[in-house]
Amino acid sequence: MTKQRRTFTPEFKREAACLVLDQGYSHAEAARSLGLVESALRRWVNQLQQERGGVTPASKALTPEQQKIQELEARITRVERLRLRSRVNELFTRGRSAPGSRTIMAMMQEEGEQIGRFKVRSLMRELALISKQPGSHAYKKATVERPDIPNTLNRAFDVEAPNQVWCGDITYVWAQGKWHYLAVVLDLYARRVVGWALSEKPDGDLVVKALDVAYEQRGKPQGLLFHSDQGSQYGSRQFRQRLWRYRMRQSMSRRGNCWDNAPMERVFRSLKSEWIPTTGYLTGQQAQRDIGQYLMGHYNWIRPHQFNDGLAPAKAEEKLKTVSGMS
């Protein structure tokens, strides 16, 4: 038969310690009179001495004053946790149920919050928040090789400054009961979206319009390298003439090799898994407005990017300007 372990209230522990501290009992005498193990009594005596000196213990307090402090601290902890829960829920909702614990942690740290991924994960679990997981991604494959346009970039995705290398690609979006086509231009330096266009036709006009937007918004840079897959739109005379007019060089991925344009694939993966409704959009105008909000707002300015050590692309560029004095 196992011996049942004795439990003691804080009041009993305090009175036992007072026998030693206030009434002159030795540790051995007090322990013997109360039927205690002397080592336990010594712990209580030490704790009571510390509490009388103003130290709040990690274990349950013995004095009424320190018990009150512990109650207040527990209340503050509860209020703080409720505040953090509320912020986690706000960020999760704003991200359309897509952000995971790492992304939310980065967002909160950027706001000045001292919080780790374990706590964020715990708060998400309490709130029953489950990040949407992206499904499989189907890559387009070119059917015609373009030996006249080499893969100059050759997966050198790390560049030293903005407006040195841009990437482009096209994806499809369901809106108004039919497919629409989205062309995006990405600056590789901080993975910032610098231009985009949406159309009902995946033609040369679409990619030219996205390039025109990027060219104007970025101050008409020249001499940069534009990289894309081997889609016919990017190999069209219309697009290549526009590159020539803007004094841009052209690079193309190898046929059927999606990894040669991996940064663009990631943008589209994030857009579709995090933002676009699974049923698509009711109208083309709604798609235009919502996709623009994601690319130029949420993706560029809010969403943390691992490539930028948790900074959103636009903020990573701003940081470069601050450090280097660029205008």
Residue map of PLM features:
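Residue-centric detector for conserved, function-critical "anchor" positions
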Residues: 1-83, 251, 324-327
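Charged DNA-binding/catalytic regions of mobile-element recombinases
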Residues: 2, 27, 65-327
